């Protein structure tokens, strides 16, 4: 849905548009879409844009990196010869050099260089286990994606790495690239089994030479980015291998210090601090230029990821005086962006008549009949490699070095011939620019000059998605500021009120907390917050209260407490429905107080026994000290996940008996204390923990055995 900015924020009279009389802005009033298609076409779109924006404006150079001769397609342009309405993915390096020297004097360069050197040393001495963090990464041994910790493990096994720090990892990586270290690993392939008459997964050992290993270290895998607001078409995100991520980690940690010292960057701040800092600094511009008119520009940069230029950061490092191994490591991290190749994680499926055809990435060019004209145009418009990967020589691709490229953006985004007349705050591709002048037209001229100069660093402000208004009214980080006051933007009501599976009490409290924060941040009305709470209550009822176990729990409580169940909250199995205005508070505590005031002592005792406050005094028992069988408390009590094996020997029978005893133990505990079935209430407990918390008196204990 599109809403006129003039009517939404300040009125059409005060609106100044760059290209039209009225611009537009998306309002988050619909559910987030979850895409189930293949990532091939979104990947090719991103690759084609990266090549298209820099076509004809790059020149190939031979550079020296760690004693190795490498090729780099470096882009450069003359800004005065460019059409400013076009999106261009190269920078004016001569103008960038001037802007860097204009922004930092020699004393500031010296101070910044020392801070960067300290951050670089600290990041190089970090243990490599920091690369384990993350959901998914590229396993360069088999070109498949897996959890980050498994990718790191596979790389260590294949290359024989024995170091501890990031510096050791980078040094070992270069030994592998120079052929001084053997690289071998295992891959799984589907092979036809003659005896079984079907395909079967088989494990194969593979060895890589120097060229193959180097090529694989630059490979990226793509998949779809889901749950995006206002996005009708999916976008591709990319994941890299261990060596790539190691260099980017060092680069990002080093440039994080630059962003913290840069007054124009707010990427390192949290959501609340970011919007409050931006609001206060835009106000300062108006105060420093009293008597002048303030115009605020906000919006979006067109194709930010595909337009970013690594060579801008190379100029930045040299102008600061960075030298030696630090310069080589950071240069290599930036050079990687010119050598990357990508392919989707999963093969693409196409239906032809009554059958479904599975097309792998390396067979796309041979299966042209399965694609339409628009898809064929994308397939033919990119550079394919023999192994099904697509070469991408330009651009950043989504979210790989945000700290570094935010620094590149702030170099050129606040240019003005008059000091402190134009001020920009940048957070990746999101920005706010304030401009002051004698009148609206003068402020607009200064703003347009800043936009033209920002083209030098590869920034392309979108004329369709951007707008500027008079005064301190802008949008930043999905929050609106009107006349200096933050307007609460709940974003997507449906997404914010969906239960997270943490249990009814916790999910209700999360909804109430979000509604309360929206009221505190800005001018979200009380009735709107209550509407959000009502939606959350309805969704929790649909998810939890139709469960068979919940109904059994409710019947047991009615037998024990009788009419006093009207004082027990629904989230604990009672009949008391939560009121919307209770969600931002402790509604369980409110129910306990009401039960005491009414004299419903059975209900009060039950509510108190379900609360986790009184158990904090006991403390959690260590897993190491307890040798009893584990009682795993799960969100869904009906799904035990206790597997049994086919009985083939005496050990299997003992194993099955132990699993059955553990299952009975679990059911006994949950039947006596149903609230343990809610994640966050019971957690992950042993029998000893349950006894210490006085949840159970006696329960059958199954001792751990080695074969279990």
UniProtKB/Swiss-Prot annotation:
Recorded hits in InterPro entries, A to Z, give: RNA-dir_pol_NSvirus, RNA_pol_PB1_influenza
A Gene Ontology BP annotation from the UniProt entry: viral RNA genome replication
What is this enzyme's EC? 2.7.7.48
Q: Where is the RdRp catalytic domain?
A: 281-467
- Pfam families registered for this protein in UniProt: Flu_PB1
User: Which controlled-vocabulary keywords does the entry list?
Assistant: Nucleotide-binding, Nucleotidyltransferase, RNA-directed RNA polymerase, Transferase, Viral RNA replication
Single GO molecular-function term? RNA-directed RNA polymerase activity
Q: Which reactions are catalysed by this chain?
A: RNA(n) + a ribonucleoside 5'-triphosphate = RNA(n+1) + diphosphate
What does this protein do, in the record's words?
A: RNA-dependent RNA polymerase which is responsible for replication and transcription of virus segments. Binds the promoter sequence of the encapsidated viral RNA. Displays an endonuclease activity involved in cap-stealing. Cleaves cellular pre-mRNA to generate primers for viral transcription.
Assembly and interaction partners: The RNA polymerase is composed of three subunits: PB1, PB2 and PA.
Q: What is this protein called?
A: RNA-directed RNA polymerase catalytic subunit
Question: What organism is the protein native to?
Answer: Infectious salmon anemia virus (isolate Atlantic salmon/Norway/810/9/99) (ISAV)
Q: What is the lineage of its organism?
A: Viruses, Riboviria, Orthornavirae, Negarnaviricota, Polyploviricotina
| Gene, per the UniProt record | Segment-2
